[in-house]
Amino acid sequence: MTLQYFSDETVNFRTPAEPREGEPFTVRFRVLKGLETTVSLHLTADGEASSREMKPVREEGIYVFWEAEAEGVRDKAEYYFITAAEDGTVWYYGKNGLSQMAAEVQPFTVLPHFSVPEWARGAVWYQIFPDRFANGDPSNDPVDGEYTDATGVPCRHAAWDEPVTAGDFNCFYGGDFQGIIDHLDYLKELGTDVIYLNPVFVSPSSHKYNTQDYEHADPHFGVIVKDAEGADRYGIRTTSKENLEASDALLAKLIEGAHSRGMRVVLDGVFNHCGDFHKWMDRYGLYRKYTGEVGAWWDSECRSSRFFRYLGYHEYESWWNNETLPKLNLDGSKELREEIFRIAEKWVSPPFNADGWRLDVAADVAHSPEANHAFWKEFRQHVRAARPDALILAEHYGDASSWLSGDEWDSVMNYDAFMDPVSLFLTGMDKHSNGYDPEEEGDGALFWDRYSKASARLPQQSLQTALNELDNHDHSRFLSRTNHTAGRLGPLGPGEAEKGVSKAILRAAVVMQMTLPGAPGIYYGDEAGLCGFTDPDNRRPFPWGKEDTVLQDFYLNAVRLHKNIPVFRDGSLVPVIMDDDLAVYGRFLGKEAALVVIHIGTEPARLRIDLSDVTGAAPHAVTRVLHSSTLACSLGRKNVPTPMGTVDLNLLPQSAEIYVW
């Protein structure tokens, strides 16, 4: 498709792309040559609206670029473009494209005080679920029956390759910090920039979203110096000073090891709720017995009783009515808020020096939107004061724009503008494998509609740092979605998640992950060929010694392309063809450009693409740097002449290709 009008928030169309307070900036608007129109800029700066004429300043191939200057702003600017044809037709252009009414326009934004860490833009993430990545120290492994709680008795899997079971939430494989340390070189070789660790603080579960102690790393991941037998084992292991200090030191060593290899580490912050084991609640009396601390379960007048909302005797507000997850009363206790801020500062400060926080269910924190926003504003101030380049990334489903103005979150886990539209287009499956819709699969126009609307809600800073994952600990493995099997582990069994999967479709997904705007995130084991339904089956142990090495090599090279081709980090994105079984898009930065072709049909297809649709000026030749299909996979470079400015493609089934010029 040849776009008649185009602009965005990249450096291609705004200079500087992110103006600071009071800094003048230039905006540009691209118009198809031959359209008889005038263009004006409608600007609202610090609440004051104005309009000004734009001027055509240069031509590039089939396009004319119009420009206007804007004065610096103090707090915020919004703008959109107005085109007026000779026949009186008026169009309005904003982040959501063309509109016939000004009220429908989603304006471009300038946020002078919104600064995200430079290292996070386009960074390649690797997410690790610690219990399932690697067991580097069997001496710290949980044992069968180490404790008993409302969810049952924990178990230790006898073998690393034992299948996950439906009731696996309290079962352990023994993965730990030492296992991660032992494989830091593997992560570096893969191209990892950021290691994202699922929760690592003291907790009785394998997932550790039911925090027991925010102050310390879990000794089952760290070091057990002091141990006991029988009923005292869990209490001694998780409350003794020797174990906690040694485990904290090992986590610091892990982070230091990552830093020495040029990688960052982001921790998982679960501040909406804690666990009923937490010393502030202490439902099972561990801290009362082993440290002398008294929790709210035992004393309704103790300091931490105000950290929860009580509904009656031993009845408290919990997250989704799960009694093992008491909800923290953050808007009702200033003391609790200060505790959380101190904890957040602690882990991004020496000697730990974590590089930021991923925030669990961040929109659920507190009990009102006002209290939620107030909390995250304070949280950001504390974390950035402790570490100015710390990243604050939220788990969020839906429109996050109200948190993305520069004083709360930096960005989000990108469900709306990546995981959802990509999964539905490539597989017809939702991210939980709850159902298969053949009408969704391969609908390129619907994919682009979903993607463009969701990405338009993100400021450019947030879009570049949004975590683009195909799957994670909460959702089915992408590779399993390719077989169109809807269901869960319990009824179906683990084998059904592995039957008839398409690694060609997975490779196409990886190509999209590495070439669309944002920060691509690899969930541990995806690169090795792990399958699995949604949790707990998506948390299978990493298959060390049984990896799909061909797939690993593909990931490694796709990551290199993402990192070595600047347009994939900073460039503009334009749709070229969005049709049945096709998603073709271009990225460009100045005169450098790339074309990405995704064809998921099961039959070969022929396609002619006019390359001037990307940048305006068509090249005389392009270089293919990646090709993948059901029949072949090539990561070598191949020069392709384009004497007429077009490229003729013979697309193999379920193929993905990248061309650069």
Predicted regions and their residues:
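C-terminal beta-strand-rich structural cap/linker in extracellular carbohydrate-active enzymes
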Residues: K33, V124, N639-W661
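Aromatic- and carboxylate-lined catalytic core of secreted/periplasmic carbohydrate-active enzymes
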Residues: P543-V576
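Conserved alpha/beta catalytic core and glycan-binding cleft of carbohydrate-active enzymes
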Residues: W119, D276-K289, P351-N353, W376, ...
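Glycan-association/targeting regions that enable binding to alpha-glucans and other polysaccharides
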Residues: M1-G122, Y126
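Conserved, mostly hydrophobic/aromatic
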Residues: F29, I128, L187, L197, ...
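Substrate-binding/active-site clefts of carbohydrate-active enzymes
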Residues: P130-D193, V200-P351, F379, A385, ...
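Short, solvent-exposed turn/loop segments enriched in Gly/Ser/Thr/Pro and often Arg
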Residues: P130-R132, I195-H207, D268-H278, D360-V365, ...
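Carbohydrate-binding surface patches
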Residues: P16, T26-R28, V576-G616
